[in-house]
Amino acid sequence: MNKKGFLDSSSTKILQDLAVAPIDLTAPGVISKERIERFSLSVEGFTLSYATERVDEGILSALEDLASERGLIESMQAMQNGEVVNYIENFPSESRPALHTATRAWVKESPLQGNAEDISLRSKIEAQRLKDFLNRYRDVFTTIVQIGIGGSELGPKALHWALKGCCPSDKKVYFVSNVDPDNAAEVLQEIDCAKTLVVTVSKSGTTLETAVNEELLADHFLKQGLHFQDHFIAVTCEGSPMDDTSKYLEVFHIWDSIGGRYSSTSMVGGVVLGFAYGFDVFLQLLEGAASMDLAALEPRMSENLPLLSAMLGIWNRNFLRYPTSAVVPYATGLEYFPAHLQQCGMESNGKSVAQTGEVIGFATSPILWGEVGTNSQHSFFQCLHQGSDIVPIEFIGFQENQRGKDIVIAGSSSSQKLFANMVAQSIALAKGRENTNPNKNFRGNRPSSLLVSERLTPYTMGALLAFYEHKIVFQGFCWGINSFDQEGVTLGKDLANQVLQVMQGQEKEGALLEAEALLRLFNNIKK
């Protein structure tokens, strides 16, 4: 498809005009029963209410036209089919597919082709190997430690935290990610090494932080008289330095076409979640994600949950020009989910070069951040209600808690109080509250949406994970950027190695000599 650029699309120009005077949420009668019913969508057990977004039918129609002009559904279909979407034209780039959806497509037996079919079949084989491994070793160990950084930690950790409230387990789970040795030392203080399985996750098999932490843990195990091969397994790409069954108890595979931040439904998340909660729980997670993958192919924006949410985000970012966006889950189980979304969104779409290789002249990823409610109401919500910047908020909530333990006080349960707080915040941000005292005046017109499901389960967590993955990817397609590389991460690794050369007194070509003065300054700090 020969698509116009984002700024050249006719719908973009229409939306720019509409953004001059968008709907006023504070006007009497705007947040009506009819609007709430009309501006909602239910898909795969989730209901999205966007009545408190600054949109009307005209804006929604123009957003749908923009999605069509930019070929978003065609691009999503191409990605799921295994076409090359990770590329920059006319410049060296990774030039490969993005096949995270194939890691779970096999559970639905979805018809695939080419690269997607290959990765789906391989993922099914790896899942069966994991099931066999768990049958042999899950009862041998009481604890698992996952070593990995970025997508090898943030996604699996968020999923583990989400499942622990609904899936009984007698296993202990820890993550070591930071190269700061205190991270590993803290975990080592907590575990019985003789009963611990360690899974090292690195696609390349050479990730600096991961290699250092593996060596640190291996040394500790050795000093306790334990053999590396009896306790350490690996998740890595075929042919990497870690792909060595003579060294590890077992090696599970992932592939270059699956980006770290999108890898939680591969063995990157499968091993630790399968060990903690059992293979069937991991399978339920995959089923939820695979269902949302199919839902993301619905051609109508009004019926496509991730596409609708993506375009609402485009409206807020590019036309209302809000620079940040908050995700606030009203569920303790999603405590680490905003951190995962922060990486997934900002590493994917924090770009200023189009796939054509041209520098772009419009905003891309907002700054993503968040925290669970109601805790967040007592930390940063003051700024959201009365601060000088408007921050769109995505609320996530559930009608039931996970653990089933609750109490009724003053006529309502704790779960009801939690849900009431979430709904109240959305309405308060939209409508505001007038007061003659300017310090108590709330101007309102602060947009938000609510995404609600019945209960946080493995299935709904899988669907929620995939929902946000697709939302982020849809936005990248709309902007015409590459959502699947991360050159900024690569730069940081390269420069750190150059600084280390200076610290070690190595005058090699490429050493970052500019760091010498800084290092000298800090070395003079008195102890």
Swiss-Prot record:
Superkingdom classification of source: Bacteria
Entry's transmembrane regions: none
InterPro entries to which the protein is assigned, alphabetical: G6P_Isomerase, G6P_Isomerase_C, Phosphoglucose_isomerase_CS, SIS_dom_sf, SIS_PGI_1, SIS_PGI_2
Compartmental location: Cytoplasm
MF GO annotations: carbohydrate derivative binding; glucose-6-phosphate isomerase activity; monosaccharide binding
Example of a GO cellular component annotation carried by this entry: cytosol
Catalytic activity: alpha-D-glucose 6-phosphate = beta-D-fructose 6-phosphate
Active site: 347 (proton donor), 378, 493
Gene Ontology terms describing biological process: gluconeogenesis; glucose 6-phosphate metabolic process; glycolytic process
Pfam families, A to Z: PGI
Function: Catalyzes the reversible isomerization of glucose-6-phosphate to fructose-6-phosphate.
Family annotation (HAMAP family): G6P_isomerase
Family classification: Belongs to the GPI family.
UniProt cross-references to PANTHER family, sorted A to Z: GLUCOSE-6-PHOSPHATE ISOMERASE
Stated name of the protein: Glucose-6-phosphate isomerase
Species, as recorded: Chlamydia caviae (strain ATCC VR-813 / DSM 19441 / 03DC25 / GPIC) (Chlamydophila caviae)
